[in-house]
Amino acid sequence: MTQVPTPTADTVRRLVRSLPAAGEAAGAGPDVRPVTEGGEHFTWWVGTRHVLRLAPEGEAAVRRRRELRLRDLVRPLVGVAVPTSVAHGDWAGGLTYTLDTRLPGRSGEVQHVSAVGEADLAGLLTGLREVSVRQAEALGVPRAAPRSLEELRTAAEGAAERLAAADEFDPGRLAQLTPPAAGQLAAQTAAAVLVHHDLKGEHLVVSADGRVRGVLGWTDAVLGDPAEDIAGLAIAVGAPAAVRAATLAGYGARPCLRGLWLSRCDTVIRLAERLRGRAEGPLPLLRTQLGRAWEPILLERVTELPGDD
């Protein structure tokens, strides 16, 4: 396999200067710097108005090409901005790049989402459900089978014990999710919807007043279980805000609680794996995400889940 060169500032400047569609970004000496959030050097700020994303390997290149078309499909439906590409092509050996407009706002990891912002998230979830499955499949968006909450619960139990030994987590908190409850919260046999599948805080662009102005990172989108996006929002903005947004979008108790417990199990497992040196990610962020997912919500007091979704 050919080794992909790590992009440098000079690499990025040369590429940007060669792009006639980049306008101001392709000036004589564009200011370029790596986007530090996410810990990658394949994403670069270009000036103040653009961001350059470089595919690091072949599979990522395929997903980036698909993302360009998918963003055009979802843009009229989701109620928030998605990036627009002003130039795209190959930067090395069949590996794609896209120069996107930079959406104004701050990362959802550092900017709080307000109540009005929760309504923006509800519009996002509603719009995703309205995307034509047929059109998404025609773009190559894959289908993903729902995850087994019981299998995830079992894995989280072991992870919780390891966290308890490190004085990081009380494993008794997982007792609420009994095997029968996990079975009751299994994904329902309903038509798949478009799922962003990576709704973490750094992919939410939030304005100073707490409005969600844009959503980034569409490369992992699938046709599948909408509870996965509810789970992503629980980790990104907290369980109460995520459930309120999902409820506003028309989701009932079952998918909301399923998403809640997906997020809780995921965050326990990720933190435990990171402490064992088997995963990456900043420990403070992983602890913060665990705390968000485990914020209590009123819906947990429901003892008998309704049958409708």
Regions found by a protein language model. Give the residues of each.
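An alpha-helical support segment within catalytic cores of ATP-dependent transferases
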Residues: 5-28, 90-91, 104, 114-115, ...
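Short helix-capping segments at alpha-helix termini
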Residues: 24, 75-80, 167-168, 240
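ATP-binding pocket architecture of kinase catalytic cores
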Residues: 30-148, 164
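Conserved catalytic motifs of the protein kinase core domain
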Residues: 47, 95, 190-192, 211
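Active-site Asp-x-Gly
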Residues: 59, 192-195, 200-256, 260
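Hydrophobic packing residues in well-ordered alpha-helices of helical domains and bundles
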Residues: 64, 117-121, 174, 264, ...
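Short strand-connecting beta-turns/loops that link adjacent beta-strands
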Residues: 91-93, 209-211, 264
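Helix-rich C-terminal or lid/interface subdomains of diverse kinases
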Residues: 108, 231-309
